[in-house]
Regions:
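N-terminal hydrophobic/helix-forming segments and targeting peptides
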Residues: 1-432
Length: 432
């Protein structure tokens, strides 16, 4: 997959919810010649390239070479991102304004979501032939339908001193003005009618939904020399894009061994779900691959012990207005290349050998790299790398691209860094 910045921006534009991240990524792999498998059917595998949609929000893709046991390599990322989710029964009215009742997903920077036009995307579930056979429909307004207005400075003179926003009160978006004289429709009917109009169904068919509000702002190159990319959802769609580049390269080069790419959901809320990295999903999927090829669990365990995994998630780049917030000797900068993330607490996966392996891969692929370690008095976040490697005891290294304003509604990255990540993933998964 050839890289250029417009291609990344186009990918991010299509990934407006975890469901759409999987759908967009799945289509990319199908276009590249991968064969789709079902999680609910037995697999009869041989050499080739396969992809599985796992519960709609996680994706598992893998390449099997002619020599199955040559080597096992896995790359991972996550499909979710900090966002605003719509609650059930979401409609509430205040003095003629119709608002959505919402909740915060992950650790988003709340004030960055104010005064931004917001679209809505996700899945809507409809009645089927029986309660176990329901229909899921992807949903994306592709236009702004909501906004969370700020309070004017004249009504809050201390706003520039910092204001704590109450998630239940001040973070509710407005979506319409209630029509004059409208008294017949219930709140549920108003919302279901809107959804029904968007997906072309009868409101009575709608049973449930998972809907994310997202900034409709598109990614853009920024700077006098176009050094930066400003975009929503850089955390962690940059990593998804890089992992996909790697697994496509494995197919292209027809490498031996088994190469896997897994894009987990729910990293931003702890990963402890059926489709997250803190469960048995990856070990179970990998065992299904091995058993379908005629190998035992012991064979798989041997390859896991010999294999290697790279977990990709974004890192905190040095902020020019707050340089003191980073470690004094280990700080990544934008356009400085891929970041190797280290923590003695193991909040990031890695040990001395894992670090050495990834440094060696970077040098082989001519990929620039840098080191990130938290300031000793400022704990950072954690990633799915340590979580998933605890469930699948495979040597793992956490890496990612440096960002500014991580978890903001719009984040900033270096315009030259994605190419470095793509090259590393292509070398890791796509070379012997």
């Amino acid at each position: 997959m050839k890289f250029d910045n417009p291609q990344l921006i186009k990918y991010i534009k299509g990934c407006t919810s975890p469901y759409h991240t999987v759908d967009t990524s799945l289509q990319l792999l199908l276009d590249a010649g991968f064969t789709e498998l079902s999680l609910e059917e037995s697999w009869n595998l041989t050499s080739g390239d396969y992809v599985v949609n796992v519960y709609g929000t996680t994706l598992f893709a893998f390449h099997i070479g002619e020599d199955y046991r040559h080597s096992l390599r896995i790359a991972s990322a996550h499909t979710d991102f900090p966002a605003i989710r719509v609650k059930p029964n979401p409609i509430t009215d205040v003095k003629g304004y119709t608002k959505l009742n919402v909740e915060m997903y992950g650790g988003l920077i709340q004030n960055t979501w104010l005064d931004r036009p917001l679209g809505a995307a996700g899945t809507v579930v409809l009645k089927g032939e029986n309660p176990y056979d329901v229909d899921s429909v992807l949903f994306d307004t592709k236009r702004p339908i909501a906004i969370i207005p700020n309070l004017a400075i004249h009504m809050n003179r201390n706003v520039n001193d910092g204001v704590a926003l109450n998630r239940q009160k001040e973070m509710l978006p407005i979506i319409m003005m209630k029509p004059d004289g409208e008294t017949t429709k219930s709140e549920e009917e108003v919302w279901n009618q809107f959804l029904a109009d968007e997906i072309n169904c009868d409101p009575s068919e709608i049973l449930s939904y998972e809907i994310t509000l997202y900034p409709v702002t598109e990614g853009a190159l920024v700077g006098t020399d176009f050094d930066f990319i400003s975009s929503p959802r850089l955390d962690n769609l940059t990593s998804c894009f890089g992992v996909l580049a790697g697994i496509v390269e494995a197919k292209k080069n027809k490498v031996d061994g088994i190469r896997c790419a897994i894009l987990f959901d729910n990293e931003e809320v702890g990963s402890r779900t059926k489709q997250g990295g803190a469960g048995m999903l990856l070990p179970n999927l990998l065992e299904r691959v091995y058993r379908s090829l005629g190998f035992s669990r012991d064979d798989m365990d041997l390859d896991v012990a010999r294999g290697f995994m790279i977990s990709s998630d974004v890192a905190h780049g040095l902020h020019p207005n707050y340089p003191e917030k980073n470690d004094i000797t280990n700080f990544p900068v934008l356009n400085g290349g891929v970041t190797l993330k280290q923590a003695c607490s193991q909040s990031y996966a890695g040990d001395a050998k894992a670090i050495a392996i990834v440094k060696g891969l970077c040098e082989e692929a001519n990929v620039a790299y840098q080191i990130y370690v938290n300031r000793s008095d400022i704990p950072g976040g954690s990633t799915v790398g340590s979580i998933s490697s605890a469930m699948l005891p495979m040597r793992t290294m956490d890496i990612g691209l440096p960002l500014l304003a991580m978890h903001s509604a719009v984040e900033t990255m270096g315009a030259r860094d994605q190419e470095q990540l793509n090259h590393l993933m292509q070398h890791f998964l796509g070379d012997e």
